[in-house]
């Protein structure tokens, strides 16, 4: 322990790294606060609570994770240059990551508002802050007076070259085929979230077992710090159930509820349960015992919920039959339609029982990539999956906004599909998949995975293998564990586990697990994994009946793509001054053009015709002159010895005065006028120097065959015909066209040039 300004500190070593826990230096007015550090990454986590008289019907826990840009020495990119507005997607996901393992550890019936804030105040961009925040939240709550049945600790498990690594660095994760975040108590893993590259089920189970052992020092450190600096927990008395009322409700409702909870259809079952509650309330209100005070009847809803839970769980354990009549391993009936939307790039309708998802895939250009401001700098994403859960999908009326749950489910489905996508070099499109939940009765996020895969295949995206997902449940009664395949919404609420697993026939790509029981034996987890694999293979088989492979061609309404490789030296010419040329191309064709320094030009256009036009316009700036080919160019300069003609963009040729016409030309300006078009034939290319002839074109027009010797280079210039710094299409420092060692006497005498050959 180190005492710094009344601070108390403990350390733990995990995976060879020191984790520092410190309290008492910052945020001392919070009920609980901890500074948790690994390397140069520091997260400050605080916990506060506030009593409330309101009965919200749920535990009002708020968890907010925030990344401060100063932590990485950066200034926010917003207009106000501060962290304002909605949390980023990562901040939302990490907030959920913290919330899920700690929420079940508060006593049932606690109504106080509890707020946990985790602020990243230093980031070395090497050690990730999310798992520190999970452990820090448990530590802050443990130090506070808030009733909390912790501790739990968080860690990341990677696998590099076949070896498990705990809390690998961000750079090390680039080589890992496994990325699992787990939270665990002393006795068991309580939360799992992760992605993998087609990893077998057995490896996941082994990773969780290994990780649980490795994080025990973090549990020890929390307990030690709590012993040193923790506050006494305030007393909390859980609400006592009215035994007489519970017995009366059970007598009135058990038989009817048993019947209602055998109705397979969700909405009909909901109506039947509602009718049972109304019948019970009607009988109780008429009871003289409650004539004067009906306050106790507020508990009827909770009593009925507990009764429903008992009926369903006992039936599953005793009979092996579930609410909709299935056994424990059967997947609900599956219906699939592909290409359901006529103008979408790719679409699919995936239905599993009463859960139905309409999923749409859209292809875009590289300019459509999502750009985000983060601690590690500007980050781009070329694949996005957005999950929507509108109120109508469960027959409710609620405000319409994107919830944390929707962001979390979308992120899970995105993880599941990411490993099967083609590399950007092979398929440079930006991909967006939107999953619209049409109806929901459990496992809607896994329906988004299945439908998302089908929509990508319908769009013609060359995925490496199909992916499917399924949600597993658990009923634990005493020492009995019953694993449920493809759980309903009611089974999720009444059960002890929600374990979502997605993958291909070869292995797992994404997992998410939340459990409500204290511990889960390894053999039970392995059984859940195996049942999930059997279900996944069944679902993949059903998907294969509709689409065996991605469509061979992209949708006619999808962007068209082409790549052109140009000389890097002419990139500035393609772009033009102030982007003039590139803007003209995009305005004319509607194409999106991305030019790399290597000379690689990616063209995305709305139609095939527009793409071809854009390609031609780009290639126009990268043309090469060919000897013997005619070009229509513009006269850029008129000299005494001839004219400079731009035959191609930024490519000029010298037309010597002797090649301006079939007749003798006294002055080049007699034939060549600045800015006018001139058709010329390229007659010589010597490195960067190009010579052209208008005379050759005129001879051909007269039916006289052009021969190279007809345009032989003249022996010398006319009198006074030296170049004095003007451009001549050559890079010879302005030397004249003579081969006489540079003498410049050359006056005309009797039609001959001194020291020269006859003119042609």
From Swiss-Prot:
GO terms for cellular component: cytosol. GO terms for molecular function: 3'-5'-RNA exonuclease activity; magnesium ion binding; polyribonucleotide nucleotidyltransferase activity; RNA binding. PROSITE patterns: KH_TYPE_1, S1. Residues 719-760 have a biased composition (Basic and acidic residues). Residues 559-618 form the KH domain. Its EC number is 2.7.7.8. Residues 628-702 form the S1 motif domain. It catalyses: RNA(n+1) + phosphate = RNA(n) + a ribonucleoside 5'-diphosphate. Mg(2+) binds at residues 492, 498. It holds the Pfam family RNase_PH_C. It comes from the Bacteria. Disulfide bonds: none annotated. It is found in: Cytoplasm. Signal peptide: none annotated. PANTHER family: POLYRIBONUCLEOTIDE NUCLEOTIDYLTRANSFERASE, POLYRIBONUCLEOTIDE NUCLEOTIDYLTRANSFERASE 1, MITOCHONDRIAL. Involved in mRNA degradation. Catalyzes the phosphorolysis of single-stranded polyribonucleotides processively in the 3'- to 5'-direction. Belongs to the polyribonucleotide nucleotidyltransferase family. This is Polyribonucleotide nucleotidyltransferase. It comes from Nitratidesulfovibrio vulgaris (strain ATCC 29579 / DSM 644 / CCUG 34227 / NCIMB 8303 / VKM B-1760 / Hildenborough) (Desulfovibrio vulgaris). The gene is pnp.
């Amino acid at each position: 322990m180190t005492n710094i300004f009344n601070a108390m500190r403990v350390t733990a070593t995990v995976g060879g790294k020191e984790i520092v826990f410190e309290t008492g230096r910052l945020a001392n007015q919070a009920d609980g606060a901890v500074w948790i550090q690994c390397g140069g990454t520091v997260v400050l986590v605080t916990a506060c609570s506030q009593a409330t008289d309101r009965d919200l019907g749920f535990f009002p826990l708020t968890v907010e994770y925030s990344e401060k840009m100063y932590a990485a020495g950066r200034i926010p990119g917003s207009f106000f240059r501060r962290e304002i507005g909605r949390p980023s997607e990562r901040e939302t996901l990490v907030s959920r990551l913290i919330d899920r393992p700690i929420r079940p550890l508060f006593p049932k019936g606690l109504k106080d508002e509890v707020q946990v804030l985790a602020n990243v105040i230093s980031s070395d961009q090497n050690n990730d802050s999310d798992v520190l925040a999970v452990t820090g939240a448990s530590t802050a709550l443990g130090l506070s007076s808030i009733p909390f049945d912790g501790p739990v600790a968080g860690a990341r498990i990677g696998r590099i070259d076949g070896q498990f690594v705990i809390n690998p660095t961000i750079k090390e994760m680039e080589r890992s085929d496994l990325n699992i975040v787990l939270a665990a108590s002393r006795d068991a893993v309580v939360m799992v979230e992760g992605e993998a590259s087609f990893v077998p089920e057995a490896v996941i189970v082994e990773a969780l077992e290994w990780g649980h052992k490795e994080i025990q020092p973090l549990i020890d450190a929390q307990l030690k710090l709590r012993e040193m600096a923790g506050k006494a927990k305030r007393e909390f008395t859980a609400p006592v159930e009215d035994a007489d009322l519970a017995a009366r409700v059970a007598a009135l409702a058990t038989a009817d509820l048993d019947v209602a909870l055998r109705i397979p259809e969700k909405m009909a079952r909901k109506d039947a349960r509602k009718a049972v509650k109304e019948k019970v309330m009607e009988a109780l209100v008429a009871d003289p015992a409650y004539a004067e005070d009906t306050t106790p009847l507020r508990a009827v809803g909770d009593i009925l919920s507990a009764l429903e839970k008992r009926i369903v769980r006992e039936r599953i354990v005793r009979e092996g039959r579930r609410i909709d009549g299935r056994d424990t391993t059967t997947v609900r009936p599956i219906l699939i339609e592909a290409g359901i939307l006529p103008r979408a790039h790719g679409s699919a309708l995936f239905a599993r029982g009463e859960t139905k998802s309409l999923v749409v895939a859209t292809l875009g250009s590289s300019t459509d990539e999502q750009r985000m401001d983060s601690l590690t700098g500007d980050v781009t994403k070329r694949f996005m999956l957005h999950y929507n859960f509108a109120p109508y999908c469960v027959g409710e009326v609620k405000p319409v906004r994107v919830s944390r749950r929707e962001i979390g489910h979308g992120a899970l489905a995105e993880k599941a599909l990411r490993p099967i996508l083609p590399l950007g070099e092979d398929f440079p499109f930006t991909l967006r998949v939107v999953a619209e939940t049409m109806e929901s009765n459990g496992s809607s996020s896994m329906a988004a995975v299945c439908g998302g895969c089908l929509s990508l295949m319908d769009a013609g995206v060359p995925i490496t293998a199909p992916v499917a997902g399924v949600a597993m449940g658990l009923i634990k009664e005493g020492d009995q564990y019953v694993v449920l395949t493809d759980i309903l919404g009611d089974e999720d609420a009444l059960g002890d586990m929600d374990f979502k697993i997605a993958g291909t026939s070869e292995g797992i790509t994404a997992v998410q697990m939340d459990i409500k029981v204290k511990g889960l034996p390894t053999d039970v987890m392995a059984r859940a994994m195996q049942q999930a694999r059997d279900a996944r293979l069944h679902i993949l088989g059903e998907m294969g009946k509709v689409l065996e492979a991605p469509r061979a061609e992209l949708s006619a309404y999808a962007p068209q793509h082409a790549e052109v490789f140009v000389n890097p030296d002419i990139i500035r010419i393609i772009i033009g001054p102030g982007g003039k040329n590139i803007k003209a191309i995009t305005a004319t064709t509607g194409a999106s053009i991305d030019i790399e320094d290597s000379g690689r030009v990616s063209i995305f256009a709305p139609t095939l015709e527009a793409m071809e036009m854009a390609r031609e316009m780009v290639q126009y700036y990268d043309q090469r002159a060919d000897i013997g080919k005619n070009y229509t160019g513009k006269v850029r300069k008129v000299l005494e010895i001839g004219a400079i003609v731009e035959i191609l963009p930024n490519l000029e040729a010298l037309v010597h005065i002797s090649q301006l016409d079939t007749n003798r030309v006294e002055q080049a300006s007699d034939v060549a006028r600045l800015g006018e078009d001139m058709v010329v034939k390229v007659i010589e290319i010597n490195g960067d120097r190009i010579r052209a002839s208008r005379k050759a074109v005129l001879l051909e027009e007269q039916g006289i065959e052009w021969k190279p010797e007809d345009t032989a280079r003249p022996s010398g210039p006319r009198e006074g015909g030296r170049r004095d710094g003007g451009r001549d299409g050559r890079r010879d420092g302005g030397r004249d066209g003579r081969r006489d060692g540079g003498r410049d006497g050359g006056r005309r005498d009797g039609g001959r040039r001194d020291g020269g050959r006859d003119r042609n």
